[in-house]
Amino acid sequence: MSKTMILAIGGAGCNMAETIMRVANAHWVKEATYLFADSDMERLSELGKKGFETLNLLRDSDSFPTDKLKGVEKLYILAGLGGVTGSKFAVIAAKSAKSDGVGNVVLIVTLPFIFEGTGKMANASEALKSLSDIPVKVLNNEDLTERYPDLNFIDAFEYSDKEALNAMESGLI
């Protein structure tokens, strides 16, 4: 097992990880251990059929199975904040990893679009506040339409995923 793990949480996190796996240049990113965690069983089943390790997150749970993190020295957590799965479990996983001795925990998260509503933005803000002691790279989805006005949403998300990868490969986070 690689000493670097990329933990994808929720739909947005899983999408980011799939893009990163496809376009990564750095050897360590390609060779990292990937774990896809979500509450969407259908999505996990699809990922499992592709040969990826998956973890079913029970929405009513307040814990993360840290046995999955044994031997990990650097943990990147990818998640979209705003929804239940990403906002809740990115925080739980990060805090569990820190308390279980993972030396370097970094989160790369997206913030919701304004049109998704104030509830999702409030969830995202609350999650960010509780992560104040952990390095976080924030990618704001609202900026996608400004930065890439000629791209459709799918392509704009891929650009955002590549920004996450660039931050990882550059060692800035």
PLM feature spans:
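Tubulin/FtsZ superfamily GTPase core signature
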Residues: 1-173
